[in-house]
Amino acid sequence: MKAPTQNDPQTRRPAAFTLETEEAARPSATQKRAPRSFDAEISLTPDEDDPFLAPADIDAAALPVATPKKSRFSFGKLGLGALGVLFSLAFGLWADQLIRNLFSRSDWLGYTATIALIVALFAVLALVGREVFGIMRLNAVQSLKADAETASLDKSPKPARAIVTRLNAVLSHRAETAKGRAALKETENDVIDGPHLIELAERELLVPLDRQARALILNSSKRVSVVTAVSPRAVVDLAYVLFEVTRLVRAMAELYGGRPGTLGMLKLLRDVVAHLAVTGSIAVGDGLAQQVLGHGLASKLSARLGEGVINGLMTARIGIAAMDLCRPLPFRAVKRPGIGDFMSDLTPDLSGGKNGEKA
């Protein structure tokens, strides 16, 4: 028979144990913090000072908008004006002496010269008047844009209504805006904040014109690309680019209601070039060439075709600047077009077709 051990329940000696109560086993309740007030105010960090904001977003928001140069006093203009008066007096004395000599020879010669002088003066006055009205139309568009910027900061609908009325007058000759004008007329009795009303006018009236402006820019860029690729001489490229850019800027101004004359066109071209020079966009140079011709495209493009693509993109950039200047409202409700929007149209897939299929 086996002897009992110490752990055998029949032979274990009695012992004392300490039992914990339920109150001790449960964790003590957390004391609630008494309400307190803080003196420090919440500070908001501006986007330009936020180090965690994407730099691309900051650059896109800070993209400069084309604005016309303000006319300033110039001694050159003063000198040209004085010379113009002097030559006008000289022409008047010459015409008077000529007509007197013709009358001394024969009356019908004198009357013919007088009628010719009157017709010439009338034509010159008509040309001057047309140029003045063209410049006034351009100034009216720029004044409307500046007033729209101010009205967009005011919540009151009254300034915005005045902007919409002026915008309707500027674009009344465009049939594409008829539907938008009717839609805005239906909102005359609605309660709309000033900024929202201006954005609504931009969507209804300017979006159809923006589509046409994009088509104008794209078609001009494609023509410049093709002519540059096939032209035998660089002087032909330069002449055609100047012609195409001038036609594009004029078409852009007429699209948005500017309709400038010759002097107004020269002023508009000067403003476009000044905007490109300020933003640094006129020097597309090596950076844009590497962007377009990189990623294996350089081996597939000839040198002339590459130059055509570069000139086409440069034409598109000039068209975007002209669009900025001629548009009667700033870009708020819709996205401002960029050079990247035309990149895919001017640089198709060279691997064979648009879908990448081998020809």
UniProtKB/Swiss-Prot annotation:
Q: Where are the transmembrane segments?
A: 75-95, 108-128
Q: Does the keyword S-adenosyl-L-methionine apply?
A: no
Indicate how the chain sits in the lipid bilayer. Answer: Multi-pass membrane protein
Q: Which Pfam families match?
A: DUF697
Disulfide cysteine pairs (residue numbers): none
Q: Name one GO cellular component term.
A: plasma membrane
Keyword Methyltransferase applies: no
Name where it's found.
Cell inner membrane
- InterPro entries on file: DUF697, UPF0283
Region named Disordered: 1-39
Q: Taxonomically, which superkingdom? A: Bacteria
Which terms are listed as keywords in the entry? Cell inner membrane, Cell membrane, Membrane, Transmembrane, Transmembrane helix
Q: Which residues form the signal peptide?
A: none
Record's NCBIfam families? hyp_HI0043 (TIGR01620)
Q: Which family does it belong to?
A: Belongs to the UPF0283 family.
UniProt-listed HAMAP family: UPF0283 (MF_01085)
Q: What is this protein called?
A: UPF0283 membrane protein Atu1356
